[in-house]
A protein has these predicted regions:
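Conserved N-terminal alpha-helix of the aminotransferase class I/II PLP-enzyme fold
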Residues: 1-6, 28
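PLP-dependent aminotransferase-like
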Residues: 13-93, 97-109, 113-118, 125
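Active-site region of PLP-dependent enzymes
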Residues: 121-127, 134-197
Length: 197
């Protein structure tokens, strides 16, 4: 993809986040996280960070969700706003993994999808597993200040073949295969990595 922000944006679309939804994000993250949520007219809802990992604090996350949400029809509802909390974007800050296994377990309990922001943690492991591979999707960045760079760029990681197929389709302007005609079956994005990168 063209950058890490596009990766987060597209991952949110693939997670069916839309207008009126809420997405949990850490208080310590790059502005791209809140921007990508806002592009979809969803609301960024910030959760506390752990001072040891700098990532989302699983204990505080659980306490908050347990106290201020309810389950209705398989969805997590914020009791204060009555909006659906559809996803959480935990960030692995400065290459240091957050307690992602605990966050994923809590998210599952509350029916919240996990999209990892692994933009700063390419090559990092947590409990012998690469960061960005614990949730439904992971977002990477290849910006000039990252461990691996292409001058710019990003990627989505997923083990879900349908999500991968849809990500490829949407990131290439939703163009259908055709020998000579430009046919598009839905609104897509020109998010593919530039040829020169």
């Amino acid at each position: 993809l063209v950058n890490g922000t596009a990766a987060i944006h597209l991952a949110l679309i693939l997670a069916d986040v839309g207008e009126g939804d809420e997405v949990l994000a850490p208080t310590f993250t790059f502005v791209a996280t809140a921007n990508a949520i806002s592009y979809l007219k969803a609301t960024p809802h910030f959760v506390d960070n752990n001072e040891d990992t700098l990532g989302v604090d699983p204990k505080k996350l659980y306490e908050y969700l347990n106290k201020f949400t309810k389950q209705k029809d398989g969805k997590c509802i914020n009791l204060k706003t009555n909006k659906i909390i559809k996803a959480i974007i935990p960030t692995h800050v400065f290459g240091h993994p957050c307690k992602i296994d605990e966050i994923v377990d809590i998210a599952r309990k509350f029916n919240i999808l996990v999209i990892e922001d692994a933009a700063e943690s390419i090559g990092s492991y947590y409990k012998n597993k690469h960061t960005g591979t614990f949730g439904l999707m992971g977002a990477l960045s290849f910006n000039g200040n990252k461990t691996i760079t292409t001058g710019g760029g990003g990627a989505i990681l997923t083990n879900n073949k349908e999500i991968a197929k849809k990500a490829k389709h949407l990131s290439t302007t939703a163009k259908l295969d055709h020998k000579w005609d430009y046919l598009h079956d839905e609104i897509g994005f020109n998010y593919r990595l530039p040829n020169i990168n």
